[in-house]
Amino acid sequence: MGQAQSDENSIPTTTTTNTPPPSANSPRDSEDTSSPSMDSLLAEAAAYGEDDNENESLEAKAQRALDCPCIADLRNGSCGSQFSEAFLCFLKSTAEEKGSDCVNPFVALQSCINANPDAFSKSVTGDEKETEKKEEQPPVQDHRIIPPLWAKDPPRSGNSKL
């Protein structure tokens, strides 16, 4: 590879996408054709009805967030109880790093998702994007590299003093 090619390959390339943040106070638009991500669903549920009563207990806020219609499919699926437990634990978490005290419920949720791959839609779990990336990549071909003759060691004679 020449110096120009090497310099060209060392320049980092970045791709940015401008996606608007999810609306925190309104339910999802039913006309939206793209499936929302898990993060946007959870953010919407956490903010669901937040402006109604600021003096409400953490337990009541967490329960109201769980009642958000935006996560109804997640609650009612085959891993619904594990999702509800993990989500409530996260919302009620008072740890400095939010949710770090909720390892067990999230491990249970992950185990359930692994045991039931169809528990949530692929667009919610992010598997859809990984599948697309795998399909886009061309198959890797194995190549046999043969070194040039000048790079090979010369045959040794029995009279060599090396």
Swiss-Prot record:
A motif (Cx9C motif 1) lies at residues 79-89. One of its GO terms (biological process) is protein targeting to mitochondrion. It comes from the Eukaryota. Residues 125-145 have a biased composition (Basic and acidic residues). Residues 76-120 form the CHCH domain. Residues 1-61, 119-162 are annotated as: Disordered. Disruption phenotype: No visible phenotype under normal growth conditions. It is found in: Mitochondrion intermembrane space; Peroxisome matrix. One of its GO terms (cellular component) is mitochondrial intermembrane space. Required for the import and folding of small cysteine-containing proteins in the mitochondrial intermembrane space. Involved in the mitochondrial oxidative folding of the copper-zinc superoxide dismutase CSD1, the copper chaperone for superoxide dismutase CCS, and subunits of the mitochondrial membrane respiratory chain NADH dehydrogenase (Complex I). Involved in the peroxisomal oxidative folding of the copper-zinc superoxide dismutase CSD3, and the fatty acid beta-oxidation multifunctional protein AIM1. This is Mitochondrial intermembrane space import and assembly protein 40 homolog. It comes from Arabidopsis thaliana. The gene is MIA40.
